[in-house]
A protein has these predicted regions:
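Bacterial N-terminal signal peptides that target proteins for export
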Residues: 8-19
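C-terminal motif of bacterial Sec signal peptides marking the signal peptidase cleavage site
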Residues: 27-30
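Acidic, metal/ion-coordinating pockets
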Residues: 32-36, 45, 51, 63-64, ...
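Short, Lys/Arg-enriched N-terminal segments with co-localized hydrophobic residues
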Residues: 1-9
Length: 446
């Protein structure tokens, strides 16, 4: 089995199917009648798409009829160890009748973007490059997730190709070591910088992952056509999740003539075919597109066009990257079919230190960690039970290991005054970043 793509069971737990819950649900539905979904209210209104009524909303609440599905039943006992009763006799469920809903806790972070300044801070006294400090404050949160995904913006081609920043990035293999140490399970490599070091860099990166960490899911770059055609499947709790990764382009660098499959591009015909295959193989489909316009805090019409393509073909979750700033989160659903899709248009940068000095630079140091809980509805079908976003900030100081990303909620105003970003954009502060998060995400973020 090719661990870069298909069906690697990273983590698996034992589950049962819920006979009692299903029977109870059927009884309740029969009693309550049919819900008129056309009367559902949303915060952003509704839009007509291809003759179907599509509603969208921005909210941190779980959605679906079974948004809160976890029920724990246990016998109450008195001091003698016997089951106690109330005035109203109730039959207690047996051990076989007591179940908990299976869940997959997923997180994803945005671009890991290593400019020259950041590489200088990662260089140690012995000349080696170490990146563990970048992720240390968020490591526990990353490792706590069942499925942790990162968008690796720059190529990891190794020191032999030279360690370079903008415009043609390349990082040493120790960056990959740090990503694995931090707890990431899946690495998205389809970005506009995937071909920065041409075919040699691409193959070097692929070989690193295959030989050093074959258990890590690496998406978006391919050594063979067979790899391009495979669908990565993550399975846990009996739920199969397909993850697809694409980029809008490669900065004008052509794919190798003998490797037209090298990078997953946003080609509609191929994307739709991939989604169809994913829908057949998995229960839940995620698309991670590298799309949009850099430094714009709102999605573009092109992003919305692609979101509709994903939605129309059955995708359940979209988590976008590339703009280097955060963008809105939107939930779309079809009131006729009941299909729902959650879209994070952009998570911004998870790690970066660009050298520009101008208005808007401060926005690039605010990022988001998407948090999504995938569970089962009463019919045993996968659903999004809950979702949200954690605001993050990259702190930068000119010293070894002086760059790291932490929760915005744990960042202090005093610490922000020591950030080098103030010299690039003097509006940078904790208060300013909180204002941007409020503007883009509303009450969704934490």
């Amino acid at each position: 089995m090719n661990c870069l793509r298909r069906g690697v069971t990273v983590k698996r737990k034992n589950i049962s199917y819920y006979v009692v819950s299903v029977l109870l649900a059927a009884f309740l539905v029969a009693c309550s009648g049919t819900k008129d979904t056309k009367n559902v209210e949303t915060t952003t209104g509704e839009q007509e798409v291809s003759g179907e009524m599509i509603q969208s909303e921005n909210s941190s609440e779980g959605f679906g009829e079974n948004a809160d599905t976890e029920h724990n039943a246990s016998d109450k006992q008195d001091s003698t160890g016997q089951s106690s009763t109330t005035d109203e006799t109730k039959e207690q469920p047996t051990e076989d009748e007591t179940f908990s809903q299976p869940e997959i806790e997923l997180i994803m972070v945005g671009d890991v973007l290593l400019h020259d300044r950041l590489e200088e801070c990662a260089k140690q006294e012995d000349g080696s490059y170490r990146y563990e400090a970048l992720f240390a404050p968020m490591k526990d949160e990353i490792q706590a997730a069942d499925l942790a995904i990162v968008n690796q913006e720059v190529l990891i081609g190794g020191e032999e190709l030279g360690i370079t920043g903008y415009p043609c990035f390349n990082a040493p293999f120790t960056l990959g070591d740090a990503l694995v140490d931090a707890g990431f399970d899946v690495v998205c490599h389809a970005t506009n910088h995937t071909m920065d070091k041409q075919k040699r860099g691409l193959l070097s990166c692929i070989n690193f992952w295959k030989t050093s960490y074959p258990h890590i899911g690496v998406l978006g770059m391919n050594e063979t056509q067979e790899e391009r055609d495979e669908i990565y499947i993550y399975e846990q709790e009996g739920i199969k999740v397909a993850i697809l990764n694409y980029t809008y382009g490669t900065n004008g660098i052509k794919l190798p003539s003998d490797m037209p499959f090298a990078v997953n591009l946003l080609d509609e015909e191929k994307v739709v075919a991939d989604i169809k295959k994913a829908e057949e193989l998995a229960d839940f489909t995620i698309v991670c597109p590298h799309w949009g316009t850099e430094y714009v805090l709102k999605q573009t019409k092109e992003q919305e066009r692609w979101a509709k393509i994903f939605f129309d073909n059955g995708v359940d979750l979209v988590i976008g990257t590339h703009p280097h700033v955060i963008e809105p989160v939107e939930m779309m659903y079809d009131v006729t079919t009941g299909h729902k899709m959650l879209v994070y248009y952009s998570l911004g940068n998870f790690v970066n230190w660009s050298g520009e000095s101008r208005d808007g630079v401060a926005n690039r140091f605010l990022g988001g960690m998407a948090k999504v809980t995938i569970s089962l509805d009463e019919g045993g079908n996968p659903m999004i039970a809950d979702y949200g976003v954690i605001a993050t900030v990259t702190h930068v100081e000119k010293k070894t290991n002086g760059v790291y990303t932490t929760r915005l909620s744990e960042y202090t105003q005093e610490l922000s005054l020591t950030s080098e970003v103030i010299k690039q954009d003097d509006v940078f502060s904790k208060e300013y970043l909180e204002g941007v998060a409020d503007k883009v995400w509303g009450e969704l973020w934490e």
